[in-house]
A protein has these predicted regions:
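Conserved alpha/beta catalytic core and glycan-binding cleft of carbohydrate-active enzymes
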Residues: 139-169
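Aromatic-lined carbohydrate-binding surfaces of glycoside hydrolases
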Residues: 1-135, 167-168
Length: 169
């Protein structure tokens, strides 16, 4: 995880202040809360260098030329600490600029970046701002997922992998 799903990291005393939601560690632990409230605060200048450092450490552990930054389920992006910035620039802009920075970092390090596509569905035209080598891992929540999201990503010309599942995440 590099954006949302950072419960373990953002629940620590060391990095808790980088969480989008103030005092998220006070929320009772549950399957839902561990996802919903643990998005990194993109308006904090310490966030991106920390995540890049973590990615650099993880990259060394794998021989694959692909690296999944995840970047899914950023439920609280722009709702708390980065709210003012989101009002100025838009939540989709905050999302794509952050993902673009991480993707470029991976490209510079010889990796093909991948990310989960559930957030980009809302603004598929932003795929054009990402590196051409970027792979959208397209998946959905519904047992009978619609084709609309897949079609929208395909129309941008971006590479996507369809990732079917039956609540296996």
């Amino acid at each position: 995880a590099s954006f949302g799903h950072l419960c373990t990291l953002l629940s620590t005393k060391t990095y808790g202040d980088l969480c989008e939601m103030e005092d998220s560690w006070k929320e009772p632990f549950s399957f839902w809360n561990r996802m919903r409230y643990h998005t990194i605060n993109v308006s904090d200048e310490r966030s991106l260098p920390l995540i890049k450092k973590m990615i650099a450490e993880y990259m060394q552990l794998f021989s694959s030329n692909k690296f999944n930054i995840c970047a899914d389920e950023t439920f609280c992006l722009g709702k708390y600490k980065s709210k003012k910035l989101a009002e100025e620039r838009g939540v989709h802009r905050l999302y794509i600029d952050y993902v673009k920075e991480l993707a470029q970092f991976l490209v510079e390090n010889g990796k093909i970046p991948m990310f989960w596509g559930d957030i980009i569905w809302n603004s598929p035209e932003l795929m054009k701002e990402l590196p051409e080598s970027m792979i959208c891992l397209n998946w959905g929540y519904a047992p009978e997922q619609r084709e609309d999201e897949t079609r929208a990503i395909a129309q941008t010309g971006a590479v996507q992998y369809l990732c079917p599942g039956v609540c296996g995440w």
